[in-house]
């Protein structure tokens, strides 16, 4: 896992790119993570990249987090972290684009079968079966909330209780209380089941 002292690196900011498909919640995952960072006392920026807005189309969302005011307003081309919400995207697009070998990738994957698709990436890779967890807890393949649990596992600056509070805020007008609780359960399960790929 990444120690709190190393989170922002030399540039003083953590830049995260979420890659998913329409309907998987990449945009809301970015928004919730930004809320978590803000509630934790950090400066934030969060913005989606709009493309074809249809279910199944690739979707990107970006978050910048820093312990000092963020003065840049450019798009994120060289993220520190890439979060992939659909493993099949490793077969159709370059999910490592702009990610250096010092970077981190977090994948929604059942096992390590994705490795040959991204063998050019030499950084740290973490994975969790976010889709399986979502299906088991909320009954639908919407892996965005389990992925937040994986991010908390990799980056201890993001606390589970703060993530759950942010989810409650985000979903209280959209989901039933029962479904919100199931999403919180999904976050916790993913936190405990996230694994690092061993080279």
Per-range role (PLM):
Residues 1-199:
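Active-site cofactor/cluster-binding pocket
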């Amino acid at each position: 896992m990444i120690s709190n002292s190393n989170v922002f690196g030399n540039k003083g900011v953590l830049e995260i790119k979420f890659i998913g498909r329409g309907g998987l919640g990449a945009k809301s995952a970015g928004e919730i993570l930004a809320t978590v960072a803000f509630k934790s006392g950090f400066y934030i920026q969060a913005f989606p990249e709009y493309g074809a807005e249809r279910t199944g189309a690739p979707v990107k969302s970006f978050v910048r987090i820093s312990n000092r005011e963020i003065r840049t307003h450019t798009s994120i081309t060289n993220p520190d972290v890439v979060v992939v919400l659909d493993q099949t995207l490793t077969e159709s697009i370059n999910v490592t684009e702009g990610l250096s070998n010092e970077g981190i990738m977090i994948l929604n994957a059942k096992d390590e079968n994705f490795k040959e698709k991204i063998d050019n990436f030499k950084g740290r890779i973490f994975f969790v079966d976010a889709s399986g967890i979502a299906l088991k807890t909320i009954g639908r393949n919407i892996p965005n909330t389990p992925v937040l649990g994986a991010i908390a596992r990799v980056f201890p600056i993001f606390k589970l209780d703060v993530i759950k509070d942010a989810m409650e805020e985000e979903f209280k007008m959209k989901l039933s209380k029962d479904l919100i609780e199931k999403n919180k359960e999904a976050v916790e399960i993913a936190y405990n089941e996230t694994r690092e790929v061993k080279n």
